[in-house]
């Protein structure tokens, strides 16, 4: 069924990629959102409804349906954003005259602070018994992620050519196809060298993949597989803090700030285009400061 709509969204895909300069993750999310909307239309009793004549009320009905099925506000907001972008695109290419999304507002969300591990929890998580090639690969991935603050998508898309083991640097392409170069500490670099020279060869198959971190089939590791590895380790280590795919990235930024790094440096390391995105970590550090004050100040 999904293949049926690939041609419909081909031009939209190109618009997001080349005109809007969106990341592939964002593009895939938007296309999935549009596909879900099409499924809703297909199930409609009104066979006259199409993407091009969908009304504002039709979309509002769909949004209500999502809420009834307990979809989170964040997910609904992203879908609305996808629909707005799509119908703006249809206006630009003169496919429609009236925009059904014009008066539909993206609901404001309460900013939730990202989950962060304590330094002790990070050290516990990274203390991996090294018995198999997979253990050495996982150790190198986790050490590199915590040492650099890379996003999971950036980590798994690293190629051998992106690593400079002599200068201790990693080059990555982040959101908006922006390139950045990040220093890597000696400790993480040693585990990278160990993996690359001694254990990565055991993952190489006939395809001889150029990606740095490989699965047992010799292909690039998926986001899902890497996150499962982290979750499994956290469970084994009895780490109670709730995990998200970016927990190590958030922990990297927060610990950098706590140890005196300035906000602008952290912004550059994380690849944030706007420093306001980075400022959320100041709230985390303030919360930690308050906790320590309450625990240790005699008059707190």
For the regions a language model picked out, list residue spans one by one:
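Conserved catalytic core of the tyrosine transesterase superfamily
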Residues: 1-300
């Amino acid at each position: 069924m999904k293949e049926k709509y690939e041609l419909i969204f081909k031009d939209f895909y190109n618009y997001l990629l080349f005109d809007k300069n969106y990341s592939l993750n964002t593009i895939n999310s938007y296309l999935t959102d549009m596909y879900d909307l099409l499924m809703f239309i297909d199930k409609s009793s009104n066979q006259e409804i199409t993407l091009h004549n969908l009304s504002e009320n039709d979309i509002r009905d769909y949004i209500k349906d999502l809420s009834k099925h307990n979809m989170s506000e964040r997910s609904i907001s992203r879908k609305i954003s996808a629909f707005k972008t799509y119908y703006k695109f249809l206006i630009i290419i003169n496919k429609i005259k009236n925009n059904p999304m014009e008066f539909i507002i993206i609901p404001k969300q309460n900013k939730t602070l990202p989950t962060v591990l304590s330094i002790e929890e990070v050290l516990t998580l990274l203390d991996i018994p090294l018995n198999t090639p997979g253990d050495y690969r996982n150790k190198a991935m986790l050490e590199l992620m915590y040492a650099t603050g890379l996003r999971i998508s950036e980590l798994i898309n690293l190629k051998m050519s992106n690593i400079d083991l002599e200068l201790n640097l990693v080059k990555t392409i982040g959101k908006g196809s922006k390139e950045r170069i990040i220093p890597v500490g000696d400790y993480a670099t040693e585990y990278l060298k160990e993996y690359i020279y001694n254990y990565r060869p055991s993952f190489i198959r006939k395809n001889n993949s150029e990606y740095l971190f490989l699965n047992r089939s010799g292909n690039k590791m998926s986001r899902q597989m890497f996150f499962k590895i982290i979750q499994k380790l956290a469970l084994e280590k009895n780490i109670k803090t709730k995990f998200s795919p970016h927990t190590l990235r958030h922990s990297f930024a927060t610990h950098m700030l706590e140890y005196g790094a300035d906000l602008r440096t952290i912004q550059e390391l994380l690849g944030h285009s706007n420093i306001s995105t980075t400022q959320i970590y100041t709230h985390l550090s303030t919360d930690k400061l308050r906790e320590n004050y309450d625990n240790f100040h005699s008059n707190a």
